[in-house]
Amino acid sequence: DDARADAKVPRREKGRARVAALLEAAGAEFAEKGFDAATMTSIAARAGASIGSLYQFFPTKDVLANALLEAYLATLIGDFERLREEAPALDAAALAHRLAPALVAFRAAHPAFAPLVETPGRSLPAAAGVRQRFRREIAAVLSAKAPGMKTAQALVYAAVVQQLMKAAIAIQGETSFTHRAAVIDELERVMASYLETVLGGR
């Protein structure tokens, strides 16, 4: 599989800066045009780099897309890890306030994320098991808040939270609906009530 080939990891600061610029350009191209329509030539041009420089670090578009998705996932997982550390000090409402809009905000900040994860007929290695991985991260946050919770139960609760987060994404995608923010606030309220129930006021 082309996407499983290795991207070249630069050793020098200049090389790392170049790779960061190439990934940023790739994100803009994928978000604007979609995976299939974006080309290595257009990505290099947007980055102000030569096509040879792009191929030096990323031999195929699949490798480039997979590297970008891995970077996005590392950022998102880092966000969950920070929330896990803070969870014991948060009540249900504060926890819901952090969780309910989290993926909406992340996708807005990284618009190429959805096309890379959801491209029909194409599955990047980094996209494998993404939903299950998010569910485990949510479960870890809930377990940090309620240390005595069994793993299986945490995963059930996490799946409910995940569905509410997906509902927030769905309503945010209805751009013709002018009350999207109000609906997301209501979803947060529903999540807070649910967390208050399942966490038992912990």
Give the location of each predicted region.
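Amphipathic alpha-helical segments used for helix-helix packing
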Residues: 84, 101-125, 139, 167-174
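Helix-turn-helix
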Residues: 21, 25, 29-63
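Amphipathic alpha-helical linker/stalk segments
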Residues: 68-95
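Amphipathic C-terminal alpha-helical segment
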Residues: 113, 140, 144, 162-180, ...
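Amphipathic alpha-helical packing segments from all-alpha helical-bundle domains
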Residues: 77-78, 94-109, 123-148, 155-159, ...
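Alpha-helical DNA-contacting segments of helix-turn-helix folds
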Residues: 42, 65-72, 127-130, 134
